[in-house]
Regions:
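Acidic/polar, glycine-enriched structural segments that form the non-catalytic walls/loops
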Residues: 2-218
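Aromatic-rich carbohydrate-recognition surfaces in CAZymes
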Residues: 105, 134-157, 215-287
Length: 287
């Protein structure tokens, strides 16, 4: 089975320069790619893609071949029966990454590869760059996290299946099949539009991005309509959506006698950027 990933996973624009490589760690094979510039937290806005940090594609070493190169050549080599595992570095259009998992002659087989992203620093929060929550102290490695996920795969998958089943059953009982499908879609959409980090004072921050609107971060009128999901499934994340707004007022950085609209433009949470205050709407939402 052939898997291929493009360096564009880690770029904002296709013309940006990138570098890819393959390596081995703890019995796993890694393919890694990122931009050459690595300007961390240098961009803010709506229709933008992250271009700092690194994308990873990972598989077990046994029965695996991997290579870095031009997409056409990689696919040609696969069709001809082999990847050039000596080619483990490449740049730009020669930086596509390919994995081949070989299972011989089989009818049904279960297998896995892993995709991951280490953004190094995720959010700028009132001038302080914050790491992703899983590495908030800077003492973890992406390789250790990948290895743990690989080893715990069966348990993690069982938990995912159990949660999927419960969500669909509860939502179906509340509103029928179509309602349940909407709830499943909303669950994925909402969670995917947030980033989990820890504030310097230890507060949990679950920061939204206002996608295809204006790119604001931690917008209060996004927090409010998504609240039912988090109040049901994880109230701590709901607190994480509110902590930053409270801090903004309590610190004196926000001086008006009502709630702010946002904390900035994603991923820079340094203060409201929205041009018009919404004192009634946002204060009501926070209450």
């Amino acid at each position: 089975v052939y898997f291929e990933a493009s360096p564009r996973w880690a770029l904002d624009q296709p013309y940006q320069q990138s570098a890819s490589k393959g390596y081995e760690a703890d019995g796993l094979l890694y393919l890694k790619s990122g931009s050459k510039e690595q300007n961390i937290l240098a961009k803010q806005g709506d229709d933008l893609r992250i271009d700092w940090g690194y994308f990873y594609m990972v598989a077990g070493k046994e029965n695996t071949a991997y290579s870095v190169g031009n997409s056409t050549e990689l696919r040609k080599n696969f069709v001809n029966g082999t990847l050039n595992s000596a080619s483990l570095e490449g740049e730009d259009s020669n930086g596509n990454m390919a994995l081949v998992r070989s299972h011989g002659k089989v009818k049904n087989v279960t297998d896995k590869i892993m995709l991951g992203y280490d953004d190094i620093y995720s959010i700028q929060y009132f001038g302080t760059n914050l790491r992703p929550y899983w590495n908030s102290k800077g003492d973890r490695t992406i390789e250790a996290e990948m290895l743990a996920a690989y080893n715990e795969y069966d348990k993690l998958l069982a938990r995912c299946y159990a949660f999927d089943k419960k969500l669909m059953e509860d939502a179906s009982a509340a509103g029928g099949k179509e309602y349940a499908e909407l709830c499943a879609l909303a669950y994925r959409q909402s969670i995917a539009a947030h980033k989990l980090v820890e504030a310097p004072n230890g507060d949990l921050l679950w920061l939204s991005k206002e996608n295809n609107s204006n790119g604001c971060i931690n917008t209060v009128d996004l927090t409010y309509p998504s609240a039912p999901l988090y109040l049901i499934y994880n109230p701590e994340l709901e607190k994480g959506m509110m902590n930053g707004i409270f801090h903004y007022s309590e610190s004196g950085k926000w001086t008006k006698p009502f709630a702010a609209h946002d904390l900035g433009t994603y991923p820079l949470a340094n203060g409201q950027v929205y041009g018009g205050d919404m004192p009634v709407e946002e204060s009501g939402n926070m209450l």
